[in-house]
């Protein structure tokens, strides 16, 4: 049976479920999660999506992204997928949500209400090769500059939210100081 995604309205109110590929072909708005893991040096862990992924293959992206299953809370889905994709277990905090829509190169449509989580982890990930073919720790200022120079090398959703991610990190540092 095909994986299901949770259909939502613009307020993130659940309105149904649909097959994942059907939702991505039709452009149905559905719930998603994006995880950003930082180390103690405040570097962000990026993953390079596996060449076998059904969309955005071979692109650099945030640490982990996926969809919660029907009846699964976003926080639980985020912890589950972070372990499955990158072999990391850590505390995650939800930071914000945003909606984005993009028509991808293979005519699939990303139309997601994305819940963004931050976590902290020091050490190397153990990526699932079906999900990620490479990884690296990067400075956020470097990433912002590289996204400006080479947007084609990154996932659309990373570009869509990176400025808000950077602003949240600045707020977090200000609160701690």
Curated annotation (Swiss-Prot):
EC number: 5.3.3.2
Pathway it works in: Isoprenoid biosynthesis; dimethylallyl diphosphate biosynthesis; dimethylallyl diphosphate from isopentenyl diphosphate: step 1/1
Residue sites binding Mn(2+) per the record: 24, 30, 67, 110, 112
Record: residues binding Mg(2+): 65, 85
InterPro entries: Idi_bact, IsopentenylPP_isomerase_typ1, NUDIX_hydrolase-like_dom_sf, NUDIX_hydrolase_dom
Cofactor: how bound: Binds 1 Mg(2+) ion per subunit. The magnesium ion binds only when substrate is bound. Binds 1 Mn(2+) ion per subunit.
Primary enzyme class: isomerase
Active site: 65, 112
PROSITE patterns assigned: NUDIX
DNA damage is among the record's keywords: no
Cofactor(s) in the UniProt record: Mg(2+); Mn(2+)
Protein's recorded name: Isopentenyl-diphosphate Delta-isomerase 1
The gene coding this protein: idi1
């Amino acid at each position: 049976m095909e994986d299901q995604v949770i259909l939502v309205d613009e307020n993130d109110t659940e309105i149904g479920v649909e097959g994942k590929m059907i939702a991505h072909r039709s452009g149905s708005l559905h719930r998603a999660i994006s995880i950003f893991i930082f180390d103690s040096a405040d570097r962000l862990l990026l993953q390079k999506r596996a060449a076998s992924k059904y969309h955005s293959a071979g692109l650099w992206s945030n640490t982990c992204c996926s969809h919660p299953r029907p009846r699964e809370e976003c926080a639980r889905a985020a912890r589950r997928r972070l372990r499955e994709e990158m072999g990391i277990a850590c505390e995650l905090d939800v930071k914000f949500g945003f909606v984005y829509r993009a028509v991808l190169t293979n005519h699939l449509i990303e139309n997601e209400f994305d819940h963004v989580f931050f976590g902290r982890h020091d050490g190397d990930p153990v990526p699932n090769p079906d999900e990620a073919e490479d990884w690296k720790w990067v400075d956020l200022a470097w990433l912002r500059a590289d996204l400006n120079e080479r947007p084609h090398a990154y996932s659309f959703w990373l570009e869509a939210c990176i400025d808000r991610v950077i602003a949240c990190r600045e707020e977090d540092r200000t609160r701690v100081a």
